[in-house]
UniProtKB/Swiss-Prot annotation:
One of its GO terms (cellular component) is cytoplasm. Gene3D superfamilies: 1.10.1750.10, 1.10.8.60, 3.30.300.180, P-loop containing nucleotide triphosphate hydrolases (3.40.50.300). Oligomerizes as a right-handed, spiral filament on DNA at oriC. Its main location: cytoplasm. This is Chromosomal replication initiator protein DnaA. It is found in: Cytoplasm. GO terms for molecular function: ATP binding; ATP hydrolysis activity; DNA replication origin binding; lipid binding. One of its GO terms (biological process) is DNA replication initiation. Keywords: ATP-binding, Cytoplasm, DNA replication, DNA-binding, Lipid-binding, Nucleotide-binding. Pfam families: Bac_DnaA, Bac_DnaA_C, DnaA_N. The keyword Nucleotide-binding applies. ATP binds at residues 175, 177-179. It comes from Klebsiella pneumoniae (strain 342). InterPro entries: AAA+_ATPase (IPR003593), Chromosome_initiator_DnaA (IPR001957), Chromosome_initiator_DnaA-like (IPR020591), Chromosome_initiator_DnaA_CS (IPR018312), DnaA_C (IPR013159), DnaA_dom (IPR013317), DnaA_N_dom (IPR024633), DnaA_N_sf (IPR038454).
């Protein structure tokens, strides 16, 4: 029995799993076959537990498919594969089975013979300004389907900085939790290693620091500062657009940090390749580690966010009230929290109980604006324009993929962004049955997990309709 068995499993798993999941959880595994036992080595306990919980049945099923009654037993271990099992010049089984161009982790940083994370001697200078907000942690980040992968990736980076997911690139619309996760990673790293030099900043601060260094003839000090941190967390990297000198300096800083196994985490409001005004060589490097999207929170997550926020403020928020708010405000977490703050303030000022009628009154203008902005008619026009078809096509009986997929997308958006029932949505799409609408919604939900393009389309349309 040879390692080709694991390579066969990898090939099948790559076909069956979304690219991000495969890159994040399966690709880091190393395998060793011995005495009819397949040992899988995970880089840390977090990955081991996740793989065993989520993918154990998939892997066992593949082993049975390939080997039948002779299928090896499966064993999980934390750490690197024993040196005795490594053949000189051999590549990782995962790397051999997976063409780099097929996954989002298009390049894994090589192991550099340099001081690693745990033994870099601390420089005598300069003094580091962390700017990490201690209030933003993993514990108070509300997890849901829309952000589950992003949170898991961030947690793993906090536990193993400078490891497989370097850089980590988080992208999504405004107010979805990207900044919270940046701070949570910073806090997690410092909790693990109190003396770690972790620096968080907005990309504009990097530009300002560089300009100031040039003005003061202190560019070498600038380079030494940014290239000797243990973790650099930069928010809204899209603001580097058209700033050529800043991009040039960040390019060299990025390379220096990566070669030193120092962690880089970046956020943006869009996918790396879609950032205009940024050099291709930088955009390429942004995708070298792991790229994960954060989508607008689904209804259940929005309710959970409201309940947690109310609990943090010692406010009793009835479940039906949280549901009422969450059903009507859908674009992002910041909008939800702002609405709840207004409700709480009004309740404190008036001494009234928080009920649905009270919330309807307190948020009257916000709710009216939301209902005015997002209608089925508006969704149909926006989707038709996005896919370059006619609204009449969405209402027609045509079943070609070029029309059917946009129609399904529009139906799913109508369910997500309006209060209309399934029969009402069906009527608005040429008198279709509610079961057709339900099928469309489920199909788009499935495709969002399997296809990066569909996930991007959905997020872009949500952002357009909610802005």
């Amino acid at each position: 029995m040879s390692l080709s068995l694991w390579q066969q499993c990898l090939a099948r798993l790559q076909d069956e799993l979304p690219a991000t999941e495969f890159s994040m959880w399966i690709r880091p595994l190393q395998a060793e076959l011995s005495d009819n036992t397949l040992a899988l080595y995970a880089p840390n306990r977090f990955v081991l537990d996740w793989v065993r919980d989520k993918y154990l049945n998939n892997i066992n099923g593949l082993l049975n498919d390939f080997c039948g009654a002779d299928a090896p037993q499966l064993r999980f271990e934390v750490g690197a594969k024993p040196a005795s099992s490594l053949q000189k010049g051999a590549v990782s089984p995962a790397a051999a089975a997976i063409p780099a161009a097929q996954v989002q982790t298009a390049r894994v940083a090589p192991t550099i013979v340099r001081p690693g994370w745990d033994n870099v001697p601390a420089p005598a200078e300069p003094t580091y300004r962390s700017n990490v907000n201690v209030k933003h942690t993993f514990d108070n980040f509300v997890e849901g389907k829309s952000n589950q992968l992003a949170r898991a990736a961030a947690r793993q980076v906090a536990d193993n900085p400078g490891g497989a997911y370097n850089p980590l690139f988080l992208y999504g619309g405004t107010g979805l939790g990207k900044t919270h996760l940046l701070h949570a990673v910073g806090n997690g790293i410092v909790a693990r290693k109190p003396n770690a030099k972790v620096v968080y900043m907005h990309s504009e601060r990097f530009v300002q620091d560089m300009v100031k260094a040039l003005q003061n003839n202190a560019i070498e000090e600038f380079k030494r500062y940014y290239r000797s941190v243990d973790a650099l967390l930069i928010d809204d990297i899209q603001f580097f657009a058209n700033k050529e000198r800043s991009q040039e300096e960040f390019f060299h800083t990025f390379n220096a940090l990566l070669e030193g196994n120092q962690q880089i985490i970046l956020t943006s409001d869009r996918y790396p390749k879609e950032i205009n005004g940024v050099e291709d060589r930088l955009k390429s490097r942004f995708g070298w580690g792991l790229t994960v999207a954060i989508e607008p929170p689904e209804l259940e997550t929005r309710v959970a966010i409201l309940m947690k926020k109310a609990d943090e403020n010692d406010i009793r928020l009835p479940g039906e009230v949280a549901f009422f708010i969450a059903k009507r405000l859908r674009s992002n977490v910041r909008e939800l929290e702002g609405a709840l703050n207004r409700v709480i303030a009004n309740a404190n000022f008036t001494g009234r109980a928080i009920t649905i009628d009270f919330v309807r009154e307190a948020l009257r203008d916000l709710l009216a604006l939301q209902e005015k902005l997002v209608t089925i008619d508006n969704i149909q026009k926006t989707v038709a324009e996005y896919y370059k078809i006619k609204v009449a096509d969405l209402l027609s009986k045509r079943r070609s993929r070029s029309v059917a997929r946009p129609r399904q997308m529009a139906m799913a958006l109508a369910k997500e962004l309006t209060n209309h029932s399934l029969p009402e949505i069906g009527d608005a799409f040429g008198g279709r049955d509610h079961t057709t609408v339900l099928h469309a919604c489920r199909k788009i939900e499935q495709l969002r997990e399997e296809s990066h393009d569909i996930k991007e389309d959905f997020s872009n349309l949500i952002r357009t309709l909610s802005s």
